[in-house]
């Protein structure tokens, strides 16, 4: 059994990680930390987990206990993993970080977007960006994995086939993305209140969202050159889900784009390229570690519209983290992740 530690288990990504690992036949959660809830039983805080973690309680982070684990997940706000990851890596413990701490390879760029100096720039050379559909072989050998964000996951998987094939005008990419309210986290905030977010939709961070440099970094690597991206996120009145509507102009209209996408993702267990003319729904991936994609060329022109949907807490966070765990430890990549989406 893989001995697992979780730092920061009281947020939405933390409890989703617990839910998924409860069904994992090769993983056992030995340590889960929370300074604010130390001593509280996991099953008392999350009744949905009763019968799965009845002997497990939250504890104050302890380097010795965490260092005795085979792998530690960080489901924490940005900056926390900076302080603890180095010590764990030195102890031989693998680290899978769900925060943004190691996603960007440029420490100065990270500081610009996150409003503080990068706390562990010396570890960036060891960090592997945990998008399995791109970095599977690097993940197998990794010590430190940076799990991609939710918007970056949906957006990159939608654009990748076009950019890798050199078919898109990389200077004019548009990502029009919608997120459920759980993407804002569990902390109390006026904008996340039911009366504020219900029956309403709005764009936000149009000037620049923290996920912009992460998306741009991935798309630039896929294209092999600089890219131009306009990324506009929106908050929608649903709990879970990301819906990305992606626009690109193709430079060769003779290419069969449906075949291109189907071939690119034919061997990917968690990317579903839907039949031509489809319109994927966020509810079809609720609770599932799946990205569903459909590709369109309206009126047969040179503008391509890619529709990409994920559950922001699963393929956009905790499910992708478990997918990385499976790859890292040489397990079947689908282990513990074969859940179908929840309907209705």
Curated annotation (Swiss-Prot):
* EC supergroup of this enzyme: oxidoreductase
Q: Where is the active site?
A: 150
Molecular-function annotations in GO: N-acetyl-gamma-glutamyl-phosphate reductase activity; NAD binding; NADP+ binding
Tell me, which GO biological process terms does this entry list?
Answer: L-arginine biosynthetic process
Annotated PROSITE patterns: ARGC
Q: Which UniProt keywords apply?
A: Amino-acid biosynthesis, Arginine biosynthesis, Cytoplasm, NADP, Oxidoreductase
Pathways per UniProt? Amino-acid biosynthesis; L-arginine biosynthesis; N(2)-acetyl-L-ornithine from L-glutamate: step 3/4
* Chemical reaction(s) catalysed: N-acetyl-L-glutamate 5-semialdehyde + phosphate + NADP(+) = N-acetyl-L-glutamyl 5-phosphate + NADPH + H(+)
Q: Which residues form the signal peptide?
A: none
Q: Tell me if Oxidoreductase is a UniProt keyword of this record.
A: yes
Q: Pfam families from the xrefs?
A: Semialdhyde_dh, Semialdhyde_dhC_1
Function text: Catalyzes the NADPH-dependent reduction of N-acetyl-5-glutamyl phosphate to yield N-acetyl-L-glutamate 5-semialdehyde.
According to its UniProt record, which protein family does this protein belong to? Belongs to the NAGSA dehydrogenase family. Type 1 subfamily.
Protein name listed in UniProt: N-acetyl-gamma-glutamyl-phosphate reductase
> What is the native source organism of this protein?
Pseudomonas putida (strain ATCC 700007 / DSM 6899 / JCM 31910 / BCRC 17059 / LMG 24140 / F1)
State the gene name recorded for this protein: argC
